Every structure is written in structure tokens, then in C-alpha cells.
Amino acid sequence: LYNGPYILKSFTSKSSIEMTKNENYWDKDKVYVSDVKLEFYDGQDQSKLAKSFGENALSLAKLFPTGSGYSEQAKEFKDEITYTPQDAASYVIGTNIDRQSYKHTAKKTDEEKQSTKKALLNKDFRQAISFAFNREAYAAQLNGKDGASKIIRNLYIPPTFVQADGKTFGEMVKTQLDTYGDEWKSTKLDDGQNGLFDAKKAKEEFAKAKTALEAEGVKFPIHIDMPVDQTTPSRVQRVQSFKQSVEEALGKENVVIDIQMLSKEDLQNVTLFAPNAAGEDWDLSDNVGWSPDYQDPSTYMDILKASSGENTKTFLGFDPSENNEAAKKVGLYDF
């Protein structure tokens, strides 16, 4: 295998990938690095990357501000620490609106399963979760308090991704969003700020949802399964932060986030690598993201089309079709 200037020399699963210069490459005189080695990092030892960087074994390394060794690393590398600018990749929390698998769950009865499903199909309930989510506290588990705002995104499609008629995409969305209800009028969609978190609004939206759901026979608290890679401390910390902010805002008597600690392989198999929606074994998942293929908002939206989107199972827990009842319930065929 080769990619032009380099030939694959070796590939060892969960260890390393090595490439060497391709002497038959047409422009080989401009390939100045003869050998490239990519090392696998499983996220467990948060001091490993900084140590390797200090030993000149890595040309760059990620630091973990919440790790136990960060204070010493900050002193040692203070003149070399930078924050990576936000790009067009967006990472979100997916909502499984049509869950079928319950191998990894805290739910004990079919009644609990149905109550959670009905809750996630309720717009006011989903909005309550969104307003209860402290994105800054969540981001701080990865970037530290000082760097948390640098990775916050409040829109799935970046607000400055495109412009039209002198307005950014975010400004155009905000104009429409304000017409959906008073709860949205004070929100801010710009990157780099905690523009959706509002515990008061979360409580108000939840109160509306609870009234409607109790009329449907839903029992509280709603138990929400959220899987995480148990071997990666920063990922566990983020999910714990999400749990804390949601339960504090809405009350444990109303909503409980049940963290499902899984191996990396099990997590991948019930999220991204699940062969179909029947294998998507979760209620909410932060193992979801997308990078654009071209400069148009449709590159983000087409993958979520209810009838044909390639990623409806990963983001929303259902296989694309013309007649999914859950997708109908939340209005996905209306767009």
C-alpha cells in the first residue's frame, strides 16, 4: 500500500503504523522526511504523551488539563502550549429515538424502557435535556477550565460555515429559531460560549414535558443509558459532567443518567460499528460527530435524511426508510 510519497512499511493493531519514503514517487526530491511512525494511544495514561514529547519521541502531544500531572507539564512546556483552533468538525450527543437493543442498560422493566422512549420522543423533554446540559463544564473535562470555551459549539453546522445576503449561517438559523418559541429568543449560537445552558429554562421545558408524558402513562424518573469507553479517563469525566449538570437541573427524581461503562470494543460495536439500528444499544451517546465533505450545509444534513441518510442509525437510532414511526413522531419527514 502507498499514498504517493510513502509506502506502508508495517501496521500493528493497537501499536503503530510505519511508513517509509517511496523512492519511485515522481516528486521524491521534495519529500524531506524519510520515515513516519504513528503510535497508537488508548487514552489511559494521560501523562504518556507529554513524557514522550519531552523525550523528543513525538513532534506534538495532547495535554490533559484535568490529569494529575498537568501542573508540572504546564511549567515544563509553558512556552510551547497552544490550543488547536476549532475547525468544521462537529461532535454532538446523539438521541436514540427508536432503541431496540437493551444488552447494556440499567432499566429493569419494559415499563421503564417504554417510559424512556416516550420521553425522548417528546420535544419539550429533549429541549429540557439540551438546556440542562452545561457544555462548558463538559468541555473543561477535556480542555481544562481556561480552554473549555475554545471547543464549545452550539450548532451541529458551524455558525460561520457559509454566508448568504450578508448573514452567517448561524444568524440565519437564529432568526428562524426565535419563531419556534420564547424559550429560544435569549439563546446564543456562536461558537466559543455556553449559549444554550439555562437551568431555569430546562426546568420550565421539563414541567411541560412531564405533564404531557404523565398523561401517556409515563413513570418517573426517566432512566437514560449513556455508554462510555471505561478505559479513557477524559471521556468518562465528560459523561460524568453531563450526568451531573442534567440531574442537578432537572432533579434525580425526574431524570437519571445511567452511565454504562464499556470496553472500547464493546462501545464501538454498539455505536459507530453497529451494523444497523437494531444494534445501537444506548439512549444518549456522545460518540457522534461529522466533518464536512464540501462547503454547503447539506453535507451535514443529507446524512440525517429520514428516508435515505447514511448516518440516521448512528445519530438517531433508526435505519433510513420512508415509514419509521419514531421519525414521524419527531417530525423528521417534514424537512
Regions found by a protein language model. Give the residues of each.
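Surface-exposed ligand-recognition segments of extracellular binding domains, strongest
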Residues: 1
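Extracytoplasmic/periplasmic ligand-capture domains
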Residues: 5-142, 163-335
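Glycine-rich, flexible loop/turn motifs
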Residues: 98, 152-153
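Surface-exposed loop and adjacent secondary-structure segments within mature catalytic domains
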Residues: 153, 157-162
